[in-house]
């Protein structure tokens, strides 16, 4: 059974990633109304008779979201039953399921009542939490923490501050990026790093949205760089923290490069999807570090208790 659960966890994680990228594809191609204002049917039909490209993209996104719902539900039930001895399992199972349901409801609401940019940005943010929760659940199922000796990990307050702070801030940056996409402001500023050669400062709403996202992205790049330097200096003996921050920096660097290429490739579809891919992976890695941070206090108490008993 455990072998089956591991395969299920991997497939579910990949399915949710496809859902995230599919949502970005729907937005990029303007396929949000590919099935009209009909939900769960498509243009009022179970199998639409007229299949335009927009309809195929939107319908595919709905089907992958539906399959993700089934897989996440099954994974939550089985992990709850067979991995309940791991402290975070129940919490992650609940988060995975609740946020997936919320994601589906937000998606349905966007179809039926109109696609407001702010609502669509929230839709992506909710999807990201569900994806990260399933990734963490998968890590627990594969016992990644045991392989890196993470169960005895103890962090200082400074490192935990950076982990929690960067993760929360990353989530806010995600919303600014989603707002750029849904406000169709990706090309509002045709130059980089300034908005335009002729107008270095933004003058209209779409330009402010774009430049605000760039500023937020620059700050998270610097913050992760600083946290990585701390990890390299002080956590070489804790590989999960050491490599966690190095991987985070690699991902945020790739994210920044792709973000710049979005501007210079006229917002090509490939760059837009890679932009969504890298931020999803970065957020999942940061959430794993958060989970380790929550364990650190418990580990410190257990270490202190063991030390007293030894004396």
UniProtKB/Swiss-Prot annotation:
Enzyme Commission number(s) of this protein: 1.17.99.9
Positions contributing to heme o binding: 61, 123
Matching InterPro entries: COX15/CtaA_fam, COX15/CtaA_HemeA_synthase, HemeA_Synthase_type1
Pfam families: COX15-CtaA
Cytoplasmic side of membrane: 1-6, 84-91, 143-159, 233-243, 293-311
Record-annotated membrane-spanning stretches: 7-27, 63-83, 92-112, 122-142, 160-180, 212-232, 244-264, 272-292
Main location as per UniProt: membrane
Any single GO BP term: heme A biosynthetic process
Keyword Transport set for record: no
Essential cofactor(s): heme b
Pathway: Porphyrin-containing compound metabolism; heme A biosynthesis; heme A from heme O: step 1/1
Record's keyword terms, sorted: Cell membrane, Disulfide bond, Heme biosynthesis, Iron, Membrane, Metal-binding, Oxidoreductase, Transmembrane, Transmembrane helix
GO molecular function, one term: metal ion binding
Reported function: Catalyzes the conversion of heme O to heme A by two successive hydroxylations of the methyl group at C8. The first hydroxylation forms heme I, the second hydroxylation results in an unstable dihydroxymethyl group, which spontaneously dehydrates, resulting in the formyl group of heme A.
Assembly with partners or alone: Interacts with CtaB.
Protein name as catalogued: Heme A synthase
Lineage of origin: Bacteria, Bacillati, Bacillota, Bacilli, Bacillales
